[in-house]
């Protein structure tokens, strides 16, 4: 059922992907995204208007810096299902420990059947740890567990934060194979648009991209190291709320105003 891309020397896809996010109640959020293809050298879903991320999520804050979130719906990378996240954060925010478990099926628009949804769920689960070093603004992440298609692996990331910019390297070992690469997230113009009383319309806040050193062999044939996102705007900068980091830039901003 995977949309084959092995007969292409290179691939490209340009889409317009508007999304609506709506707060329903305390901690509850509805997200709906539709993908409009503009140009692509692929086929199947890449040539059709199709649903993007469509989810309903509930976040809960427990005592002692413990947070939980459950999300259900249609995710990125053609996965549909549910995911549960739990996270513990120290008072100063420099250490985070977490875990997640998800159960998803394959979901895609195909030429022969329209919207196809598989009947065999796949389970993915991870343990995570994150450490922030305030003097150099470096964030170190380590996670290990089971990916979507059954391979077990470990991934480590090192990310440097520059204001609203985030640039990092990663290394991945899964299914007996080594991979690595880099990633970045940069802010886009138009982030500070004025809010209407009821809603606001604005472009994406960030452009995020990840480069993988190895994208052939088992990483294609066996779909190793595959994961998904539960939000259309997930990146390593927009959800980075480290207290020391925020305090540092608030002080710098105040110093500029007083000069």
Segments predicted by a language model, with ranges:
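Flexible, glycine-rich linker and terminal segments associated
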Residues: 1, 96, 108-109, 117-118, ...
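Short, small-residue-biased leader/transition segments that mark boundaries at the very start
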Residues: 3-5
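Feature captures outer-membrane beta-barrel proteins of Gram-negative bacteria and organelles
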Residues: 14-25, 49-62, 81-101, 123-133, ...
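Membrane-embedded beta-strand positions of outer-membrane beta-barrel proteins
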Residues: 30-34, 68-70, 97-101, 129, ...
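Hydrophobic alpha-helical bundles in membrane proteins
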Residues: 36, 54-71
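Surface-exposed loop and membrane-interface regions of Gram-negative outer-membrane beta-barrel proteins
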Residues: 38-54
């Amino acid at each position: 059922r995977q949309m084959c891309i092995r007969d292409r020397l290179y691939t490209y896809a340009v889409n317009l992907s508007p999304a609506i996010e709506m707060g329903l109640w305390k901690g509850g959020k509805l997200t709906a995204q539709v993908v409009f293809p503009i140009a692509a050298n692929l086929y199947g879903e890449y040539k059709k208007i199709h649903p993007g991320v469509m989810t309903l999520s509930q976040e809960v804050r427990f005592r002692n810096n413990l947070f939980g979130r459950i999300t259900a719906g249609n995710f990125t990378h053609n996965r549909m299902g549910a995911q549960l996240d739990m996270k513990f954060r120290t008072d100063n925010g420099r250490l985070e420990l977490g875990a997640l478990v998800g159960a998803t099926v394959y979901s895609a628009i195909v030429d022969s059947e329209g919207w196809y949804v598989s009947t065999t769920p796949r389970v993915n689960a991870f343990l995570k740890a994150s450490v922030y070093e305030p003097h150099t603004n470096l964030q170190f992440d380590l996670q290990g567990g089971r990916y979507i298609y059954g391979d077990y692996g470990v991934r480590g990331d090192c990310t440097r934060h520059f204001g609203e910019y985030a640039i990092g390297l990663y290394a991945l070992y899964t299914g007996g194979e080594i991979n690595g690469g880099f990633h970045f997230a940069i802010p886009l113009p138009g982030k500070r648009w004025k809010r209407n009383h009821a809603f606001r319309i604005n472009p994406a806040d960030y452009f995020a991209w990840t480069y993988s050193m190895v994208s052939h062999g088992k990483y294609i044939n066996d779909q190793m190291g595959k994961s998904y996102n539960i939000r259309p705007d997930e990146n390593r900068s927009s959800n980075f709320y480290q207290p020391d980091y925020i305090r540092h830039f608030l002080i710098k901003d105040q110093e500029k105003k007083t000069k």
